[in-house]
Amino acid sequence: MSTSTARFRHQANRRTRRGRRLTVRTVITGITLATALACAERPHAQGVPGFLGTITDSQAVFSVPALPRPAYLTPVTEPTFGTRITRITGDAGSIISPTLGMWGNDARQVYSKQQPWNSTGTLLSVENRAGDASASPLILDGETYQPKYTPCSAFDNYEYRWHPSPDYPNVQIAVSRAGTELMWFDVANCRKLRTWTLPFPANYGIGSGEGNVSDDGRYAVISDGTRMVVVDMDPRGSAPAYPFKRIGPVYTFAPCSLQTGDAMFCPNGNISISPSGRYIDLKFGSGGVSCDTLCDMHRIFEVDSLLAIRPHRMADNSLRCGSFASRPDGWVFPLKHADMALDPFDNNEDVLLGGRACPGSSLGRVVKVRLRDGKVTALTDPSNEASYSHGSARNTQRPGWFYVTYAKASGSAGRRFSGEIVAVKLDGSGTVQRFGHYRSTAGSYRAQAHAVPSPDGRRVLFASDWAEGCGSDCGSPSVFSGYVIDARTGRDTIPPDTVQDLRKK
């Protein structure tokens, strides 16, 4: 069967399979004006323009009411926050379709820093692994979540990102398994559009698994354990256009003295070009040694017009941590599970966003660092705040917000945001938008939520085993599924039940 024929049959199967688009039951006639007004008057139910549900009260503490595990592709209302939740991956061992194989035990998004939706929100990529899984990743319809197709056989998609520009909605940017080729690949038409031979093998794809390309899809940084290089994938201005291959000089990591007695102890945890393409964030790994500040240390490099790389000097008085306090040669305040964004409240400066990781610091759990000079801004109030787990700034079409997955471990019980997915505003005001509880044990890595927003920030995809806060209908701690919280307006929904604020009076 030809690729085009197979793709057509996949489309035909999608149209006939389950025979419907998802709808949400209309219940307007059952809601009285008094009920609607009561919902509007509740402090926690204050709305955000353009959003359905979500809670803006940053001080409220909520328990997790029981919510049975949603059936596949059947939306339910989040009982506390009023958003909609849909499980978008099927039951383990069930048939996806006659041509697409079976669902595995581990079907979810990749990670909080990797965007699962394409630039237009019309396609969505999920992993499908373990158990009876047939193929991974799977491409779903980005709106209905119906499976569309499996990977093209010619696509060496070892490590990939969707192209962030709406001009390339079908294109993924990928590094081959061998780490020797960077490519643009049209996953809808199974066609390689652009290719670059890398000057050295990348040790693990784009940014050691956690990097992204610049917001316009032009720049990428590729690395191994000791080197990095910038690729201009879409040359403009005075540079010749593609297929001219514009690759910068290879930069070798300088001694960094992360470990006393070993100046070359500089393990590469992950690396990424900044949204503007002007900076590189190199996050160092612990290398298995005892952690203090070095476990979450970041060093910022600058990229010049010739794509040459050098450490970027920070302001001498910018806040740093521990023995790095007096080292402004690229070092910044340590952050865990950090992502980068352009800050609309600061002239679109590149900023690093993540969890506070300086021992003894009294800042809020969520912190912003400006890459130009290392300026530190706390974005949340630390009082009774749950621990930070992961964060995502993949909402590139809704700038000004950072989506945080808060921990639900025993140390966070009874705290604000415990077990929640929360958007935090970048202006330092402490403004939040609370989307929902993720109802997972988070007992293993793949059971962690790793919430990631859609490009427009109105939907959030998270992973869960749905084995806590589930009442009598729970999932299994060994089965991991993908769930979408949908906060878009324009669809009828049932308002959430009245919930109790458990904050300490």
Pin down the residues of each PLM region.
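Asp-box/WD-like beta-propeller blade repeats and closely related beta-sheet repeat scaffolds
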Residues: 151-228, 235, 241-260
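Structural motif
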Residues: 132-139, 179-185, 226-232, 288-302, ...
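Acidic, serine/threonine- and glycine-rich low-complexity intrinsically disordered segments
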Residues: 237-382
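Blade-level signature of beta-propeller repeat domains, shared across WD40, Kelch, NHL, RCC1
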Residues: 446-493
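Short glycine-/Asp-/Thr-/Trp-enriched loop segments that recur within the blades
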Residues: 94-110, 201-207, 253-266, 324-326, ...
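Loop/turn-rich, solvent-exposed surfaces of beta-rich toroidal or solenoidal domains
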Residues: 348-440
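Blade-terminus and WD-like Trp-Asp/Gly-His loop motifs, strongest in beta-propeller folds
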Residues: 107-109, 114-123, 154-176, 205-219, ...
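Blade/loop signatures of beta-propeller domains
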Residues: 53-95
